[in-house]
């Protein structure tokens, strides 16, 4: 039982979501894109994710494998985007 608890503590929970701009004029907005998977993947990995891509229908970077506690995941609650 103790080994299971220790294993669960070591395993980091991952989360997926849209990347969020955290500074400047677009703070609180999703990171936008059109077709640039390379940019989204690089930005995702810089923020601790495993894979990022441009979700074409939403025109925003989507990141998989971010730490669950990441402040870089866009949510409606954090949406302070005015545009």
UniProtKB/Swiss-Prot annotation:
Signal found in the keyword field: yes
SMART domains xref list: Knot1 (SM00505)
SUPFAM superfamilies recorded: Scorpion toxin-like
GO molecular function, one term: sodium channel inhibitor activity
Pfam families: Toxin_3 (PF00537)
Functional note: Binds voltage-independently at site-4 of sodium channels (Nav) and shift the voltage of activation toward more negative potentials thereby affecting sodium channel activation and promoting spontaneous and repetitive firing.
Superkingdom field: Eukaryota
The entry's keywords: Disulfide bond, Ion channel impairing toxin, Neurotoxin, Secreted, Signal, Toxin, Voltage-gated sodium channel impairing toxin
Localization: Secreted
Family: Belongs to the long (4 C-C) scorpion toxin superfamily. Sodium channel inhibitor family. Beta subfamily.
GO terms classed as biological process: defense response
S-S bridge residues: 29-81, 33-54, 40-61, 44-63
Predominant cellular place of this UniProt entry's protein: secreted
Keyword Secreted: yes
Coiled-coil stretches: none
Tissue expr: Expressed by the venom gland.
GO cellular component, one term: extracellular region
Official protein name in the record: Neurotoxin LmNaTx34.5
Organism per entry: Lychas mucronatus (Chinese swimming scorpion)
Entry domain remark: Has the structural arrangement of an alpha-helix connected to antiparallel beta-sheets by disulfide bonds (CS-alpha/beta).
